[in-house]
C-alpha cells in the first residue's frame, strides 16, 4: 500500500523523552514546580492520556517495545541491554514503526538517543575483537556505525554509545557518546567520546529537527536527509533529556522551582515548542500528528528533589524508573491529531504505548502479519473518543531490569514479585 500524499496523509512527529516523569508536566500534575507551557499548549490542542504505560520501566526495553509492538521480555530481549558494544537489540527482519511507515511511502528520520545499540561489528577493524577489548580506537570510521538506518529509518542523527576508560579510575570503563549522522561522525572530525559535549546535544538535535521540517516543507535543500520526493514524514525525536547528566544551558538555569532537573525539563519543553513552531511556520501543523511521551518514569534522584524543592516527578504515584510500581511505567502521553482527536480532552483508560504500531496500522489500513506487532493493541478508538472509558482494552504488561513482571488492567495492578521496588526507595519517603 502506498500513500498518495496530496496533503492528506498526515506527517507524524513522535517525541520520546528520557526519564520524564508523569508529575513533571503541568497538564498532568498541576502541582508541578516546572513550567511546561508548550506541552500544556499541546495538551489543550489534543488529548491527554492520563493512564498511559510504557512497555518497560527502563530505557532500552521501553524503546524496543514502542518501535516493534513486541514486549521486550520475549526472548529476554532487552531486559538488560548488556555490553556497551552489543549488537542492535532489534532483531534483523523485525518490523519497526519506521519500516511499516516506510512501506507505505513515508520518509523516516530519527534524531536523539536511539538507545538500542548498533551494528558495531561491521565497522570494527577486526570483526573478531572480543567485546571487552573494543574501544573507540577499534573502529574503521570510514565505515558507518549503523542503528536506526538498518531498522527502517532513512536518516539519523544519533548519539552513538562508546565505552571509554574512566578518567578517575582507568581500570574501569564508563559509557560516553559521539554524534553520528547516518552512521558517520557528524562533524567530519576524529571520534573522541571522552570529550562529548552534553550541553550541545539537545540544541543540536533540535536545530536539525527544525531543518528537517523545513526540508520536508520545501523551504530548505538538504541532501543529507535523502528526501527525493514530496512525501509524508515520520520524525522520531528521542532526546536524552532529562536523563542524567543534568546539563541545562545558561538561558534555562533558574527557570523552574525544581533545581537543575526542573531547568532541564524547561529546556526540553522549549525544544518541543520549537518543533511545534517550525510546523506552524511551514504550514504543516494542521496535517501533522504530534505525540509526546517518555520511555519510563523519573530517575531515583527525584527523591532528593522532593526533599530539596518539594517537587514530585512521579506525581501522586509510587515508584520511579526501574520500578514496577506505577511511577516507573506510567508516563505523560499527549496527542494532537487535527481532525481526529478532539482538542482539550482527557482519556482515563489504561493503555500501553506498545500499541503505537497497531494504532497507526489501523488508521492506515495496514494488515500486520502474525510475526509483527504481536503485543500491540490499537488505542485509535480512545483517540477518536477520548472521554469514553473502554474496559475491553487488554492488560498492559511491563517489567523491571531484573525481569520482574507487572500487569495493569482496568483498576488493578498485579506485581509478580515480592515488591514493586527495583530502584532504591528511601526510608523517609515510605
Predicted regions, residues:
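Formylglycine-dependent sulfatase
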Residues: 1-429
